[in-house]
Amino acid sequence: MIVPIFFLFSLLFSSSHGAIQDFCVADYSAPQGPAGYSCKNPAKVTVDNFVYSGLGITGNTTNLIKAAVTTAFDNQFPGVNGLGISLARPDLAPGGVIPFHTHPGASEIIIVIEGSLCAAFVSSDNKVYLKSLKKGDTMIFPSGLLHFQLNAGKNNALFFVAFNSPNPGLQLVDYALFGNDLATELVAAASFLDPAEIKRLKAVLGGSG
């Protein structure tokens, strides 16, 4: 029952509604504009445009953050284009983390399917909202606020995420600071971090400068 209820949540979470036409399946052959993808000719739309099977596959967590995120955004799932909804599936190995990040274009709601999580977001006045989550728990992360999810347990963790946008955007704080080519001296001046530590993190995260 958990997953069907979650899908209902994702629909209620949407703030966008098709007022002019029933749907706007993404036309990947047309140029993408600021408002998203153009609509596919309805005569060429099939039921397969509204079905996506990618979230049934376990992600590969053999990486630096011991986590994988499989997305069902408008660039993978054409049916969500224009509907104001999308989904994602994060898999976290023990010790895995989705590091501090923001979604500039969307709020999100998660539901834990397997394992447990430590999750938090930080408000604009720097207040932390932290909670340990278990199977079946849900948590909301307001749009644009820094947040993270950590698997502090001994078993793998799986949760699903719903967004009120077909493409919520993503900025990881660590990569924004250290995965770029901004000069170390400037990063140090702007962040108060030690230059040696900045260079170390740039090397780890693929930055330069």
From Swiss-Prot:
Any one GO CC term of the record: apoplast
Residue intervals of the Cupin type-1 domain: 53-199
Name of one Pfam family that matches: Cupin_1
Record note on temperature dependence: Antibacterial activity retained between 10 and 70 degrees Celsius.
Glycan attachment sites: N60
pH dependence (record): Antibacterial activity retained between pH 7 and 10.
BP GO annotations: defense response to fungus; defense response to Gram-negative bacterium; defense response to Gram-positive bacterium; killing of cells of another organism
GO terms of molecular function: manganese ion binding
Functional description taken from the UniProt entry: Has antibacterial activity against B.subtilis (MIC=5 ug), B.cereus (MIC=50 ug), A.hydrophila (MIC=2.5 ug), S.marcescens(MIC=10 ug), S.enterica (MIC=10 ug), P.entomophila (MIC=2.5 ug) and P.rhodesiae (MIC=10 ug). Has antifungal activity against F.solani KACC 40384 and F.oxysporum KACC 40032. Probably has no oxalate oxidase activity even if the active site is conserved.
Annotated family: Belongs to the germin family.
The protein's name in its UniProt record: Germin-like protein
Source organism of the structure: Morus alba (White mulberry)
